[in-house]
Regions:
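Short linear motifs at secondary-structure transitions and domain/linker junctions
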Residues: 20-24, 49-55, 89-95
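Catalytic cores and adjacent binding grooves of peptidoglycan-active enzymes
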Residues: 64-65, 69-74, 78-144
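Extracytoplasmic cell-surface/polysaccharide-interacting catalytic and binding patches
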Residues: 1-39, 116, 126-144
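Extended, low-complexity, intrinsically disordered C-terminal regulatory tails
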Residues: 34-61
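Amphipathic alpha-helical interface surfaces
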Residues: 25-32, 42, 55, 72, ...
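Aromatic-rich, lipid-facing transmembrane alpha helices and their immediate juxtamembrane interface loops
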Residues: 16, 63-64
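Short amphipathic alpha-helical surface micro-motifs
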Residues: 27-29, 55-59, 96-101
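Disulfide-bonded cysteines in secreted/extracellular proteins and peptides
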Residues: 14-18, 42, 52, 81
C-alpha cells in the first residue's frame, strides 16, 4: 500500500464506497503531492484520486482509460490561501530530483484566475512523473 505524509488512504480510495485504490494509486503521484503541499504551505483539499471503472463510468465526460482509473491522477481544490493563478504556478514548478507532474488541467469556476480558492486542478503522472524543468507538460484548461 502506498504512503504519504499529507494524504490519508481515505482520500485516495474510490469515492463510490468500494474501497478500491490501495493496490493501484501511484506512489510517485503521492510523493509529488506531498512536495507540492510543503511548497504551498497550507492545507490542500483533494477532490478525487482513484476511481474504480464502475465509478468512473458514472462521471459525465470521463473517458474509460482515465488516469484516475489507472491511479496516476489527482484533482486538487485551489486553496483559499492562493489565487488560482498562484496555485497553477506552484503546480507547474514543483520538481524533485526525479521530475515533476507530467500533465495538468485547470478548471476555474469564475474564469478570471484571480479569485482565492477558485477552481481545481487535475494533475497526473501518466509518464512516471519524470518531466524535467524546461520540458513542456501536457496541459489543458477551461479559462476563458
Amino acid at each position: 500500500m502506498p504512503s504519504a505524509r499529507y494524504v490519508s488512504p481515505g482520500e485516495w480510495r474510490c469515492r463510490c464506497g468500494c474501497g478500491g485504490g490501495d493496490d493501484v494509486v501511484s506512489q510517485r503521484l503521492l510523493d509529488l503531492f506531498d512536495l507540492l503541499r510543503e511548497r504551498v504551505g497550507c492545507a490542500l483539499q483533494i477532490n478525487c484520486v482513484y476511481r474504480c471503472p464502475a465509478h468512473n463510468a458514472s462521471i459525465p465526460g470521463a473517458v474509460p482509460n482515465s488516469q484516475h482509473v489507472l491511479g496516476t491522477a489527482m484533482d486538487i481544490q485551489c486553496p483559499k490561501c492562493l489565487t488560482s493563478g498562484q496555485f497553477k504556478w506552484y503546480v507547474e514548478t514543483t520538481f524533485d530530483e526525479t521530475g515533476g507532474f507530467d500533465a495538468y488541467g485547470w478548471y476555474v469556476y469564475d474564469g478570471s484566475g484571480e479569485s482565492y480558492g477558485d477552481g481545481f486542478i487535475h494533475v497526473d503522472v501518466r509518464n512516471g512523473g519524470v518531466r524535467q524543468e524546461g520540458e513542456e507538460a501536457i496541459y489543458w484548461d477551461d479559462i476563458g
